[in-house]
């Protein structure tokens, strides 16, 4: 383990994620085949220096400096590895839009951790990176699938150790993700929720989550339809999304089995059979257009490999 040389660079690819999928609030998340790419390079200067260069449509919403999540995550690696921090530049090709409920912040955290760790010879294990990622983000449902890939259920055990279960998602189930031009911060979406819920609502969610996971494992659309319901967060969040109810109704009318807010929103995810994907996509975009909101709705697959890095000269 040694300090990276000036100019040393790694490239980290990190997938978007969708969290909750209805009943899996703050514990269930899935990686999608839409990636942000981070090229991280050591530059001259003190460890407090961090430069951010954004490529892509959404760059105007992000800033560099010490509060940037890539920088903060990298600092956690230096500290955990007992190393002096170094100056970094991060050049980001942004395909995952921020403040849309698709884990953009998780991509920054995972990239900062994985990239900084790679630059110094990977002294930290993937398990340690996972622990740091959850600590920085504050909840596991985006950072875990972003790092590991696939459909992940994460819970803190009685031992206070984070436990991750990789769940099955059959390839015949497709995700249509309607991404609007409007933004919604996670903090605003969390403020909309009550501080306490009835036990009956928690019981309904437990049952729904069981049905959803079995539906995703088997491709049973009826189970997905019955399982993709929530009483913990969605009843309080739909009203924050302009036209959201109409987009959901349009997706179901076009043949989707189920529909949910992606993460904190405002993006909306619909699950359907492969032959329904394009029809569901068109219906969701049209419904948002009627509400005066521009959007796009790609049909996406589960991304199973998670985040990975390579030396810059390898690609």
UniProtKB/Swiss-Prot annotation:
Swiss-Prot/TrEMBL keywords: Amino-acid biosynthesis, ATP-binding, Cytoplasm, Kinase, Nucleotide-binding, Threonine biosynthesis, Transferase
Family indicated by similarity: Belongs to the GHMP kinase family. Homoserine kinase subfamily.
Species for this entry: Parasynechococcus marenigrum (strain WH8102)
Cell compartment(s), UniProt: Cytoplasm
Pathway involvement of the protein, from the record: Amino-acid biosynthesis; L-threonine biosynthesis; L-threonine from L-aspartate: step 4/5
Subcellular location, principal: cytoplasm
Protein role: Catalyzes the ATP-dependent phosphorylation of L-homoserine to L-homoserine phosphate.
Classification via InterPro entries: GHMP_kinase_C_dom (IPR013750), GHMP_kinase_C_sf (IPR036554), GHMP_kinase_N_dom (IPR006204), GHMP_knse_ATP-bd_CS (IPR006203), Homoserine_kinase (IPR000870), Ribosomal_Su5_D2-typ_SF (IPR020568), Ribsml_uS5_D2-typ_fold_subgr (IPR014721)
Binding site for ATP: 97-107
Domain of life: Bacteria
Stated name of the protein: Homoserine kinase
């Amino acid at each position: 383990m040694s300090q990276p040389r000036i100019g040393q660079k790694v490239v980290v690819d990190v997938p978007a994620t969708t969290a909750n999928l209805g009943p899996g609030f703050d514990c269930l998340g899935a990686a999608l085949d839409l990636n942000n790419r981070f090229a991280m390079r050591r530059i001259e200067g003190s460890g407090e220096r961090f430069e951010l260069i954004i490529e892509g449509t959404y760059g105007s919403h992000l800033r560099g400096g010490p509060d940037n999540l890539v920088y903060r995550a990298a600092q956690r690696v230096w500290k955990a590895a007992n190393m002096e921090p170094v100056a970094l530049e991060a050049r980001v090709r942004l395909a995952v839009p921020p403040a849309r409920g698709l884990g953009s912040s998780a991509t920054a955290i995972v990239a900062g951790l994985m990239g900084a760790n790679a630059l110094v010879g990977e002294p930290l294990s993937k398990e340690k990176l996972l622990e740091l990622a959850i600590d920085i983000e504050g909840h596991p449902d985006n950072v875990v699938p972003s790092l590991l890939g696939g459909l992940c259920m994460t819970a803190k055990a009685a031992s206070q150790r984070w436990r991750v279960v990789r769940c099955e998602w059959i390839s015949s189930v497709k995700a249509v993700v309607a991404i609007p031009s409007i933004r919604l911060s996670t903090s605003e979406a969390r403020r909309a929720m009550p501080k306490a819920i009835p036990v009956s609502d928690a019981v309904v969610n437990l049952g729904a989550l069981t049905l959803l996971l079995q539906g995703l494992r088997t491709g049973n659309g009826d189970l997905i339809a019955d399982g993709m319901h929530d009483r913990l967060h969605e009843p309080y969040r739909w009203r924050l999304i302009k036209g959201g109810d109409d987009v959901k109704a349009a997706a179901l009318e076009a043949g989707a089995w189920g529909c949910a807010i992606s993460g904190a929103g405002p993006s909306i995810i619909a699950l359907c059979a492969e032959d329904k994907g394009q029809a569901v996509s068109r219906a969701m975009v049209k419904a948002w257009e009627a509400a005066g909101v521009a959007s796009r709705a790609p049909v996406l697959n589960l991304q199973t490999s998670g985040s990975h890095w390579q030396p810059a000269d390898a690609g």
